[in-house]
Amino acid sequence: MYAPIRSPITELNESTPSSIPVATSYATCSASFAKLVALLVDDMAGLSIVLSEIYIYFKLLFLIVITESIQNKLEDIVKEYKKRGIDLGIITNVDEVSLFFDTSQYAEAIKKKVIEIVRQSGTGRAKIDFKTNGYVIKFAIQRGYYNRNTIEKLKSLVDYLHEQKIRCGYEIKGDLIFVMSLTDFLQKISEDVKEKLKDERVKIASKQEYTKYIVVIKVEQ
């Protein structure tokens, strides 16, 4: 890519006789010195460019190696959560790795269960609004579509989800509201990521993409 860097001394020797007469004038010495300085400046500029390229190359190489290290550790987390029925994924860029998981399937499964409970209660077909606010997902069951049997079944569902470390509950304010919070779910994965990458020099942040219910845990170097 680059021509060999020629030493300024080599350049000077090639263009200067092997022995300089004693009578060499001051002007000749000054010219030789000026040429030496010019060669030094040129070579240092070239060396600077080469060093810059080497720095960039090693920086990119370093980032790629570290990214692979981080990615391998994140893949371990993906496998662990896969066993629990939770799908995670990894997005890799040159300078960052993002771990993401899709909460829609997780929330939709619970939504279907709530609908099933309400329909089985014998009170007719329930209309359930699926809303999000931060990490809180609400299922609003309209008035007249729930009874004691419905509430008992929802209590059982809430108890089951609590056993799965999912914070949720219900409240009755005219309509019956079933509330599920994914905050703890996200926090648990974030803690696992931090623990797994504790030996890496990374910054970890998380955010939620509200449009697709995608939660992203970003790992930056």
UniProtKB/Swiss-Prot annotation:
Coiled coil ranges: none
GO CC entries: host cell membrane; membrane
Keywords assigned by UniProt, alphabetized: Host membrane, Membrane, Transmembrane, Transmembrane helix
Record topological domains on the Extracellular side: 1-45
Membrane association type: Single-pass membrane protein
Localization, UniProt: Host membrane
Stretches that traverse the bilayer: 46-66
Primary residence: host cell
Residue intervals annotated with topology Cytoplasmic: 67-221
UniProt-recorded name of the protein: Uncharacterized protein ORF221
Organism: Acidianus filamentous virus 1 (isolate United States/Yellowstone)
